[in-house]
């Protein structure tokens, strides 16, 4: 599996703000928005482009555009925080949705929503979720995408844990990973250590319903 860890001073500074327990919801969202855009930028590096003629106020020039913009697929709830930065970088991208909640006892994903194109063959997919912990949710989502024909899937995560990275690598699924960091492990509740806490709660406040 191809893994890209984005090593950049601005990435590190935003990651620090996300980790800091003093960052309130607004500060966390702002840092996540910045970091999300940086990760999308890096993930887009190898997308196919096409060239065309464009006219400047002075002369003709060669223009460049994406040949096929990716579909952005957030894993709800926390992945919603990565839609705006993704669309700011790729405004003509489509957006799909996968809803997964975590069972706090088993730590397994519980699906509750799937809104995706029926056919994803020959379509680049950016699967976005701030956290890659055990890998359970991401693997469930990747299998849904693969079942619809996706073979070009990029998982974009702000913080990844080594056990989740290992699970992805061992799955044999068609995925590459772009992340800001790989943390060493998980605690007894399957939270990333040192991590940044519950990304969904820190983006939007505590969830007050059970799914």
Swiss-Prot record:
Positions with a binding annotation for uracil: 192, 197-199
Sorted UniProt keywords: Allosteric enzyme, Glycosyltransferase, GTP-binding, Magnesium, Nucleotide-binding, Transferase
UniProt binding sites for 5-phospho-alpha-D-ribose 1-diphosphate: 77, 102, 129-137, 198
GO biological process, one term: UMP salvage
GO molecular function list: GTP binding; magnesium ion binding; uracil phosphoribosyltransferase activity
Regulation: Allosterically activated by GTP.
Coiled coil: none
Role of this protein: Catalyzes the conversion of uracil and 5-phospho-alpha-D-ribose 1-diphosphate (PRPP) to UMP and diphosphate.
Stated name of the protein: Uracil phosphoribosyltransferase
